[in-house]
């Protein structure tokens, strides 16, 4: 089965769906919103072609569930807020939003939410139905999605860490697995494995920047949020805990060691310096803003479906309940690729052990995601200067 067929979130509205387990990502979007408003302000002041009539934006790696339209809402509100601050008396521009993700993404669940979303947008923002048009653009952002110089603003949150493929070179010429008993490029991975993952990320992100520069208008903007490398004080990350859970099943005899050794997740958390270096070497974009921030990976446990903080009852401070919440989030993201390789029957056991390991980390006050926000502007052509 092709990687793109299994590298997607759990669809639907069930307990294991991404739609039901994405409160952490809501916190990330809330953290990024002030930067989004700043980025939109710079975009509108740049006076790009046709921007006062129709602003074309896209969310790259939109997934499904409530967060998808939460991102759209934040973009629309930012545009209207900045225009009001600028005292722009021209008629509001139409906003055309493209939601992009892999073909197996559950776009239908998003479409079902659109009627109520449009009504809410009209009630809260005064935007008449038809002034914000939302469409899907299925496909991989590792390839071309839009016509040349057609887009004003591109947004992506928690997607760029996913690679276009498992790096080559993880098996030696003698057929020996280089990344033995590991599922990604961890701190314990051999240097050749770490280099293979970095090389693949460099290739993918360079291609991403080049293609996006072709799709954006001159001086168009791009706002990216992704996981980046943490430090020793963060404790084991969720991929480490997932790796530990699968190793436990191997030790207990529930999985064959060869099955683990042949599994590598196409994901890479780059360092800030690695990301900056790739942007500078590719050369199409100027870095306008860069910030890192940490969030506990159980932070979303205290957030309800409307991104409001729940009451602080003893239940919500219990590390086992919080760990189970983190396990549900990870399952909603990685179940398709895990089930494809290990089989569906073992999935509950993997995440039961994951939750056990996560509870130990949470009890110690550790367990953080290190996140990066980077705002980019496409460099103007010489003829535009």
From Swiss-Prot:
Report the cofactors: Mg(2+)
Give the record's cofactor note, including how many are bound: Binds 1 Mg(2+) ion per subunit.
- Single Gene Ontology BP term? methylation
Report the GO molecular function annotations.
metal ion binding; methyltransferase activity
Gene3D superfamilies in UniProt: Methyltransferase, alpha-helical capping domain, Vaccinia Virus protein VP39
The protein's site described by Involved in substrate discrimination is found at 155, 267, 344
| Tissue expression notes | Expressed in roots, stems, young and old leaves.
Binding of caffeine, residues:
158, 161-162, 238, 369
**InterPro entries of this UniProt entry?**
MeTrfase_7 (IPR005299), MeTrfase_capping (IPR042086), SAM-dependent_MTases_sf (IPR029063)
Per its UniProt record, what Pfam families does this chain match?
Methyltransf_7 (PF03492)
Q: Does the keyword Transferase apply?
A: yes
Q: Which UniProt keywords apply?
A: Alkaloid metabolism, Magnesium, Metal-binding, Methyltransferase, S-adenosyl-L-methionine, Transferase
What family, per the record?
A: Belongs to the methyltransferase superfamily. Type-7 methyltransferase family.
Instruction: Please state what the protein is called.
Output: Probable caffeine synthase 3
Organism, per UniProt?
Answer: Coffea arabica (Arabian coffee)
Q: What is the lineage of its organism?
A: Eukaryota, Viridiplantae, Streptophyta, Embryophyta, Tracheophyta
